[in-house]
Swiss-Prot record:
The active site is at 11, 137. Keywords: ATP-binding, Isoprene biosynthesis, Kinase, Nucleotide-binding, Transferase. It comes from Aeromonas salmonicida (strain A449). SUPFAM superfamilies: GHMP Kinase, C-terminal domain, Ribosomal protein S5 domain 2-like. The lineage of its organism: Bacteria, Pseudomonadati, Pseudomonadota, Gammaproteobacteria, Aeromonadales. It comes from the Bacteria. ATP binds at residues 95-105. GO terms for molecular function: 4-(cytidine 5'-diphospho)-2-C-methyl-D-erythritol kinase activity; ATP binding. It catalyses: 4-CDP-2-C-methyl-D-erythritol + ATP = 4-CDP-2-C-methyl-D-erythritol 2-phosphate + ADP + H(+). This is 4-diphosphocytidyl-2-C-methyl-D-erythritol kinase.
Length: 289
């Protein structure tokens, strides 16, 4: 059987409002997630009768106990009736510290793929509950649908957004999410609004001004991109993005991007490429019976 390549797609926060800080230190948010048809790729080779997990290539500076891929697999292993292991191969295309969900998406793909390959039998809700232990963004990747998120990101309302193309730039810096949310200068008082009102209003990112102040390269990239199209930062950065009606317009601007920044063009997707892959595999399995 041919090895299956499982996608771990990027996401964008089309807006991000910080509504307040909870007593436990987490923040109340309202945000809108959409997936992109661009991301990392993972391959999984199941290893029966062992709990061994290996990842290649290793991510420099990230030990196994901190790696979200290994941590996701360990969480799933704990739900199995008998030992199962895996050798995992990662093709890393998404930047770390970029605000486009690279680590969270890898974790979600690991949960979804190994749940299938190990025949663990966990449902979507159970996988999402495991995912939230790894990060607030993991459940949206597990569920695989563009969504309006509230709370700390755990309350998800699926949405259907118009098709669009995006140009994403990665400034040459790494933004730590925890540092942004711990910063005393972060705005934390945006009033909560109903989703339909948010859709009709001006989309913004409450983290953007702070991150631009702390990371001048983000401000430079955003300023450059704003010359061509309305642009915002995604998540807590460092990536910034602009929306276009068609691929041609986005690629014309990509061709002009200064060499000091990495960038890519991708299509927005309401259904995650991971969800599409899982459905295709499930259909193949049914057809073989």
């Amino acid at each position: 059987m041919a090895t299956i390549r499982w996608p771990a797609p990027a996401k964008l926060n089309l807006f991000l409002n910080v509504n307040g800080r909870r007593p436990d230190g987490y923040h109340e948010l309202q945000t809108l997630f959409i997936f992109l048809d661009h991301g990392d790729w993972l391959e999984f080779e199941p290893l029966p009768d062992t709990d061994q997990l290996t990842l290649s290539p290793a991510i420099p500076g990230v030990p196994d106990e901190q790696n979200l891929i290994i941590r996701a697999a360990r969480l799933l292993q704990a739900r199995l009736p008998s030992p199962q292991g895996a050798h995992i191969r990662l093709e890393k295309l998404l930047p770390m510290g970029g605000g486009i969900g690279g680590g969270s998406s890898d974790a979600a793909t690991t949960l979804v793929a190994l749940n299938h390959l190990w025949q663990a039998g966990l449902g979507e809700d159970e996988l999402a509950e495991l995912g939230v232990q790894l990060g607030a963004d993991v459940p949206v990747f597990v569920r695989g649908r563009a969504a309006f998120a509230e709370g700390v990101g755990e309350r998800l309302q699926p949405v259907e957004l118009p098709g669009a193309w995006y140009l994403v730039l990665k400034p040459d810096c790494h933004v730590a999410t925890a540092a942004v949310f711990q910063d005393p200068d972060l705005p934390r008082a945006t009033p909560k609004m109903a989703f339909h009102n948010l859709l009709e209003g001006e989309w913004k990112n409450d983290c953007e001004l702070l991150v631009k102040k702390r990371y001048p390269e983000v401000a430079n990239a955003l300023g450059w991109l704003l010359e061509y199209a309305p642009s915002r930062m995604t998540g807590t950065g460092a990536c910034v993005f602009a929306q276009f009606e068609d691929e041609k317009a986005a690629r014309e601007v990509l061709a002009k991007v200064p060499k000091r920044w990495d960038g890519f063009v991708a299509k927005g997707e309401n259904i995650s490429p991971l969800f599409v892959t899982l459905q295709q595999i499930s259909d193949w399995d049914i057809a073989k019976r």
